[in-house]
């Protein structure tokens, strides 16, 4: 499909919505047909391209193989569509990560203190502990209850980007079972 003489040449471009028909019994399949919907997400913004690569790698490493999930496909499609009509926003990436965790059943509980299973208090700060949840903590880098409510509601514009990124990375790392994401190290080298 990559060779210029192939009848599929040009159809398999990154972030383009296509329907593939393939056959084969092993993991290496034979491509039989491509039906492209002509939805082209050719946003060449370096940050959005990195985000696409990161999301694709994340999905490959976190999902079991060969199990279709319509809700996850719709989530992915909405993420890709968001960058075809606007510029890159880190909040969109964080929303995708949080929504992905929810769809996979690893969603974060933003309502209770995991140590004593009580409701969060307004005057307390909370630290996220992977596989456990939020716990009361006096560290300045932690979230207030008001911030956690905003994150739960996906109102991320006023949330500190570094704290939010640390939160999603910790939650996702717990789901990856020690698998590294190469796209993160690649982006660090580029920036």
Where do the PLM segments sit?
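Non-catalytic alpha-helical scaffolds and adjoining flexible linkers that form interface surfaces
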Residues: 1-191
